[in-house]
C-alpha cells in the first residue's frame, strides 16, 4: 500500500512539476531564435531605441528610429 502511494505521488505531483519547468523555457528559446533572424540594422535599431538613442538616417530616409542629419 505504501509503495502504491509513493508511485501515485511521483506520477501525480513530481512528474507534472518537471513538465511545467520545461514548458516555461520554450518562450525564451523562441524569443532568442526570433532575435537571431533579424538583420544587423534592425537589431541595432531596436537596441538604440531601447536605450533612447537616435542616429542619423542614411540617404535622407527618415523614420522613427533615426533623425534627419544635415550633412
Curated annotation (Swiss-Prot):
A Pfam family annotated for this UniProt entry: Conotoxin
InterPro entries cross-referenced by the UniProt entry: Conotoxin
Cleavable signal peptide: 1-24
GO cellular component, one term: extracellular region
Disulfide bonds: 56-68, 57-66, 62-69
Prosegment location in residue numbers: 25-54
Record's keyword terms, sorted: Amidation, Disulfide bond, Neurotoxin, Secreted, Signal, Toxin
UniProt PTM: Has been found to be amidated by Han et al. (2006), and to be unmodified by Ju et al. (2022). Ju et al. (2022) describe a disulfide connectivity (C56-C62; C57-C68; C66-C69) that differs from that of Han and colleagues (2006 and 2007).
Localization annotation: Secreted
UniProt family annotation: Belongs to the conotoxin M superfamily.
Free-text note regarding domains: The cysteine framework is III (CC-C-C-CC). Classified in the M-1 branch, since 1 residue stands between the fourth and the fifth cysteine residues.
Protein name (record): Conotoxin mr3e
